[in-house]
Amino acid sequence: MRNVFLLPVGQLTAERGGPEAASLVFWGTGATRVRVVSRLPAAVNEQIGHEFAASHQYVAIAVYYDAETLPQLAAHFYRQAVEERNHAMMLVQYLLDAGEDVAVPGVAEPQTSFSNAAEPVELALAQEKTVTQQIAGLVELARQENDLVGEQFLHWFLKEQREEVSSMSALLAVVKRAGDSLLLVEDFLSRNAVGDQGAPEADAPAAAGGAL
């Protein structure tokens, strides 16, 4: 079943006939009908691409640290890569459950070269802040369209992003304080849980194919 959302009158368009599109409703009778189309499914499809891109970037960061023989940092970002992949698949499942089309996009090549050990974490923090803004935009769009189900679904991601920004900020502070003594960072990560440790949270949305 397609989702139906109400938009402000200024966003309505009248048309004569034509095939029904995703996430719309027709009002009126006769040849002239009013069509209301939700913009949220397309925006969620776009966010799927952002989540996969984030996962791809975290793989590149993990490989960088692995090559530098920093196994704790590498393991942290391998977990982050899986987590972002899971987020993408949660969005996929949301669209599938809503009866919407899913368009899995390609992703741009990630950054693979870094000038120092802190740069990858700086990049990761900037990425998490960007994703937070993107999710906030989706929540606002759902609210504009009076899509209460979509807004409730997306609030989990907002909470998750707050935690991600906080944990990545903490990791960056540790890396910067350590300077060239990166074994101190390795020791810190071996003794302290920073971010999610791999298992999906109990209240996490279902992921298409199952979370890894």
Functional labels for PLM-detected ranges:
Residues M1-L212:
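Iron-associated oxidoreductase/ferritin-like identity signal
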